[in-house]
């Protein structure tokens, strides 16, 4: 085994715990700030729809915003848990790895789409239309929170790990086949 092949195998071994950690990180990032604004009462909202307003009691905020948030982070929590469980299964059982890597890749793409879609207009995806009707004004301009940005970054990193695992499982086999062909030619001479 060459030095390069040994390094690739060690990195492939780290892919599964990395994907497990990425799935758990997605679950955590959905529960922190996805958007905030400096306008009006300066609300801050998590991916799961929990709104925080400085100086307001939690009961008042919950009464007004209870059913008026979009909760895009809910799908991220579910998909993050799926990624973590499937990565643990792939790490534990090598025969499950091809299907596990496909499922992790698909879930990561969906998380990335949810994250980018929410990142494009946080207020529109975090609050429902009823909030603007109740405020009798347009939704405030919101800045993306660290949870939303982190979700997009983790989804991209998961896709990079999936791509590396797939490519590294295909390329060494092609190299091994070439070496076998060379050896056959050498032996027959």
Language model regions located:
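Hydrophobic alpha-helical transmembrane segments
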Residues: 70-92, 152-159
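N-terminal signal-anchor transmembrane alpha helix
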Residues: 10-36
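Juxtamembrane transmembrane-helix termini
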Residues: 32-39, 93, 117-124, 164-178
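Hydrophobic alpha-helical transmembrane segments of polytopic
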Residues: 15-22, 79-83, 100-110, 147, ...
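Long, glycine/tryptophan/cysteine-rich extracytoplasmic
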Residues: 28-73, 122-144
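Intrinsically disordered terminal tails
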Residues: 1-16, 163-189
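Hydrophobic alpha-helical transmembrane segments of integral membrane proteins
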Residues: 94-132, 183-189
